[in-house]
């Protein structure tokens, strides 16, 4: 999900305008000529040589965990600047803000050097960026496609759905994947979209998130996944959706004017080493990649999941099952970070089965005050008591305690929100990716994930999650009466015990009270 007010609430408020706005609109135009293309796998580029020099075995996969937002943004821009053959880029959201414009400039600059750029963006949050995407496509070596696009009503998210109301069931399915592949040999994947709040650059609220850079054995599968989405019938050339009014030279000038705001990557305070001791990627590439090695499998929903007409059909191809199957097979411990955590009855039963086998289960999710989509919290809260009675340890992130934890680098006085999607199973198997443990990831959106077997990577992920649990979260537990809940945390002045949802405003409570019971879990 993106950082935004709730889509469904906005749509509901605007529902009365539907009749006025729908007429004459409904379906995306058919694109008869949609050329297919495949990933380019470089063996002689500088990036390829750096990977080859660091790899102990070409069948193994190397990992560089990136919990720091500044470092993660730097890695993307660094890869774009060093690519010589290809950049394959797939995101749910690229915002038209400082970070989005910096990222888009890096793609343009690569194309000007002769790098083939394929950019695939979901069409839900392209509001304010239509021209930017269309104009980038006017450059040589660049193709831009929109996934599952809306035909019209492009002024806002609400008007997109209203203007396409007859196709709501289809358009409600979104591409939530996040992936960047450079020269076919290095990839960055994980939870981050491209916007200020994902890289600790927003003055108001920022996400605690996690990405991973990967090389080696898993790359062939990642290339195949990208190609499957790029060549799917749901990926439409941007110029077929956002109609241009000028020639290619005009569009290029407009793009340059829109994105060249003077900010350079060097102005971003990338730490000399992050909380895990990792150097900026440029130094890693120049001085030798210091990676954790193991085995890995990448997985994704098939693009046609968005065409599923029933929940059962969508679940039959759900990438989420790759995670839950491994979680359910755990023998000792499961540690989960899921910002949007709506387990449903089957998920609760799966966790109950685990704790019944003496498997220790701990889940970190957002508190009501921390979540960017308060209605999702109702889907979690309705299962909270059952989970606690089953023996699951629950931790809820505080939005205001985050800036006290220097290692997580949430800027002082901004709100902290959890966005990392990760799990560690038996201290050796790691999941990282875009998949939330909620109903939308299960049966609505397409997702991308990675399952890695590496005790060292597992230790790093556990350490990062523990930082948030220890200094920035409330532990949810039963009060002395064994029925009501309380939220426990430690502070500089002693223990804190609260008996109501911590830091939540009356408006949050009212919104959930009024709308929560009526929103189907498939929409959360």
Over which residues does each language-model region extend?
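Bacterial N-terminal signal peptides that target proteins for export
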Residues: 2-13
């Amino acid at each position: 999900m993106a950082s935004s007010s709730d889509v469904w609430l906005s749509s509901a408020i605007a529902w009365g305008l539907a009749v006025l706005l729908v007429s004459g609109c409904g379906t995306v135009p058919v694109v008869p000529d949609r050329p297919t293309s495949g990933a380019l796998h470089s063996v002689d580029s500088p990036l390829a040589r750096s990977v080859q020099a660091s790899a102990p075995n070409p069948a193994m996969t190397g990992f560089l965990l990136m919990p720091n937002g500044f470092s993660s943004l730097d890695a993307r821009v660094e890869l774009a600047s060093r690519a010589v053959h290809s950049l394959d880029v797939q995101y749910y959201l690229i915002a038209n803000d400082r970070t989005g414009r910096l990222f888009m400039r890096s793609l343009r600059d690569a194309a000007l050097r002769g790098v083939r750029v394929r950019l695939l963006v979901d069409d839900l949050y392209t509001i304010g960026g239509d021209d930017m995407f269309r104009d980038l496509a006017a450059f040589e070596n660049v193709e831009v496609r929109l996934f599952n696009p809306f035909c019209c009503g492009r002024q806002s998210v609400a008007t997109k759905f209203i203007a396409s109301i007859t196709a709501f069931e289809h358009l409600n399915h979104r591409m939530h994947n996040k992936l960047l592949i450079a020269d076919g040999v290095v990839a960055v994947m994980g939870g981050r979209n491209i916007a200020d709040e994902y890289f600790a650059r927003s003055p108001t609220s920022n996400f605690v998130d996690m990405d991973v850079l990967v090389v080696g054995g898993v790359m062939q599968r990642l290339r195949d996944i990208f190609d499957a989405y790029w060549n799917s019938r749901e990926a439409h050339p941007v110029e077929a959706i956002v109609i241009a009014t000028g020639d290619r030279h005009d569009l290029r000038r407009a793009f340059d004017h829109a994105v060249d705001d003077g900010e350079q990557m060097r102005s971003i305070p990338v730490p000399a080493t992050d909380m895990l001791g990792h150097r900026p990627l440029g130094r890693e590439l120049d001085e030798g990649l210091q990676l954790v090695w193991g085995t890995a499998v990448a997985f994704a929903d098939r693009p046609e999941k968005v065409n599923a007409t029933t929940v059962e059909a969508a679940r039959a191809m759900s990438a989420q099952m790759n995670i839950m199957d491994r979680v359910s097979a755990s023998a000792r411990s499961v540690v989960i970070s899921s910002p949007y955590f709506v387990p449903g009855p089957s998920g609760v039963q799966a966790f109950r089965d685990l704790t019944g086998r003496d498997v220790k289960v701990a889940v970190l999710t957002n508190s009501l005050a921390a979540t960017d989509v308060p209605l999702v919290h109702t889907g979690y809260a309705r299962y909270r008591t059952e989970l606690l009675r089953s023996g699951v340890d629950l931790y809820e992130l505080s939005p205001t305690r985050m800036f006290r934890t220097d290692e997580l680098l949430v800027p002082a006085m901004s709100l902290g929100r959890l966005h990392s999607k990760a799990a560690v199973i038996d201290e050796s198997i790691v999941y990282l990716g875009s998949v939330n443990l909620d109903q939308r990831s299960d049966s609505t959106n397409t997702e991308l994930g990675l399952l890695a077997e590496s005790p060292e990577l597992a230790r790093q992920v556990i350490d990062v999650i523990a930082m948030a649990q220890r200094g920035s979260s409330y532990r949810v537990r039963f009060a002395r009466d064994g029925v009501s809940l309380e939220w426990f945390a430690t502070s500089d002045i002693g223990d804190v015990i609260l008996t109501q949802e911590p830091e939540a405003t009356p408006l949050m409570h009212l919104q959930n009270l009024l709308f929560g019971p009526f929103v189907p879990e498939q929409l959360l």
